[in-house]
UniProtKB/Swiss-Prot annotation:
It is found in: Cell membrane. Disulfide bonds: none annotated. The lineage of its organism: Bacteria, Bacillati, Bacillota, Bacilli, Lactobacillales. The keyword Transmembrane applies. This is Thiamine precursor transporter HmpT. It is a multi-pass membrane protein. Keywords: Cell membrane, Membrane, Transmembrane, Transmembrane helix, Transport.
């Protein structure tokens, strides 16, 4: 009995590579924000939004959740890692939920910014959570814009030939 065919292995491999690339992108460009008790500005969202544009919502949820989890684990924010798994996983899923890109963007922004606002408020107080709102809003907007630019360029290279968006 064949457990996995070549198509599934190729898809799993591609998702693992994209998760690693998203993690590395986020880890290399991580900037702690003073006075915001745990907020960081990172380019992780570029990988999440690029994943949703290239692969689909389920794949982006997996990539976003695991890459964010690994980022927090290795960057000294382990108190956030399980929250990040859920928040960025939800962000990736909602970014591809409907056929309306503006609605998807708004939903994904709300889950990411709102999720970290609640977690930050419970961990460090609501004043700190309010102070960190702008960081997450900027991170989402920059991630979305860069992904909109990068996704067509990546598609044109042909490296994703044979992979169908779900």
């Amino acid at each position: 009995m064949k457990l996995m065919d070549n198509k599934n292995i190729k898809k799993l491999t591609l998702l693992a590579i994209w998760t690693a690339l998203t993690f590395v992108l986020g880890r290399l460009f991580t900037f702690p924000i003073p006075g915001s008790a745990g907020n960081i500005l990172t380019l992780l969202d570029v990988g999440i939004y690029t994943a949703v544009f290239l692969f689909g919502k389920r794949e982006a949820a997996i990539i976003g959740g695991f890459a964010a989890f690994l980022l927090d684990l290795t960057a000294g924010f382990s108190n956030y890692m399980f929250f990040s798994l859920i928040i960025h996983g939800g962000q990736g899923y909602l970014a591809g939920l409907t056929r309306y890109k503006w609605l998807n963007f708004l939903l994904s922004l709300l889950v990411m910014v709102g999720g970290y606002f609640i977690v930050g408020g419970l961990m460090y107080g609501w004043g700190s959570a309010i102070a960190g709102l702008w960081v997450n809003i900027v991170q989402v907007i920059v991630g979305f814009v860069l992904a909109k630019v990068l996704s067509p360029l990546i598609e044109r290279t042909g490296i994703l030939n044979g992979f169908r968006k779900a």
